Amino acid sequence: KSEEVMNWWQNIMPMADPDKTDRTMLTRNRVSRIFFLRKFFDYPISMKKETFVNMGFCNMMKAGFGYLWSCVHKLPETSLENFYINRFGRPLYEMFFEGYTEKVWGVHPSKLGADWGSQRVKGLSILSVLKDMFQKAFGTKKDNQHVETSLIEQFIYPKYGPGQLWETVASDVKQMGGEVLMQHEVIGVNIEDDKVVSVVAKTTTGEEVVFPCDYFFSTMPIKDLVPAIKGIDVPEQVREIATSLPYRDFITVGLCVKEMQIKNQTAIQTYKNRVPDTWIYIQERDVRIGRLQVFNNWSPYLVKDYENTMWIGLEYFCTEGDKFWNMSKEDFIQMAIDELVKIDIIRKEDVLDACHVKIKKAYPSYYGSYY
């Protein structure tokens, strides 16, 4: 979406032949679908025959009348719930947005601000979906830079995943004489005369080290940055809001499997008839998994034995300290496997290997002191 960012990415990792160099970006097709009622739906929802068949006649009629009602009875956009209802109608909101949104944020959409919806789906609505369908049918669709985020069909991706981009940047910094310090927790940002003059970091041994600086760029969560500021009086209200900002934490389980039970039923040709999806949004209410990534489709170079195995990532949203966060690695992996077996995506005996990764403060939340 940003030409400046795209140019920077491709300056670091140009679009070269992946069979000749590792330092390259791949152009990938974005295929994201919704898994609901043990069936696949396009993401965003399309007006195809398969959608109506999978939805069923009664649900289809409810969705149609619900959308028409929402066109003439607009709700005040004081919440994410009203934001979605205004664009899709209540029945579609309840089918495809309500449960999943609560899964992601741990809060009902009626208690979330409309800001997140305006950023995530922006101008997306039933009308924009129909417009996109007609543009594709008549060959007048614009490039990805000028379409809604949820309608983008291609993206560029590092050969070995996003971590490779930052490993490459770190390598370039070192080659130019710079130093990249790992396992240093920033605990202080010292300011003099309205300028950051030094940063205090704590090492894994507990030692505190001071680094004088001319420039300071922060990617810290605001919740951690504001309390670390020294040398100026941060207004109490600002400090209080910053330290109480809510965040959503994240756990991902990686599974190496022989195969997936779900197969490709699209017109897209795939290896061994595997599903073409990069992301699958799991809308089923009887499991806690939120999204499923199929890494073979992000980059075939991510999977050592691409021909005979699939590498998938199960995404769970939680809060640090809750029962999911505190669950042992072994128990969590077993729960994740059981959930995919339950919804007929894999077989237990096909699991070859697994890993478990926790990520704190993965997403800032749009409620509480955010307002």
Short names for language-model regions:
Residues 50-51, 60-189, 197, 212, ...:
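Active-site/ligand-binding neighborhood in enzyme catalytic cores
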Residues 1-71:
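Dinucleotide-binding Rossmann-like beta1-alpha1 core, especially the glycine-rich loop
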Residues 182-312, 317-326, 330, 334-344:
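Mid-domain catalytic core of redox enzymes
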Residues 322, 333-371:
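Flavin (FAD/FMN) cofactor-binding core of flavoprotein oxidoreductases
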Residues 38, 84, 101, 169, ...:
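A residue-level signal for conserved active-site and pocket-lining positions in enzyme catalytic cores
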Residues 9, 52, 191, 227-229, ...:
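Short glycine-/acidic-enriched loop or helix-start segments at secondary-structure transitions
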Residues 15, 77, 86, 175-180, ...:
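Surface-exposed helix-capping loop/turn segments at secondary-structure junctions
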Residues 6-10, 81, 85, 170, ...:
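Non-transmembrane alpha-helical segments in soluble domains
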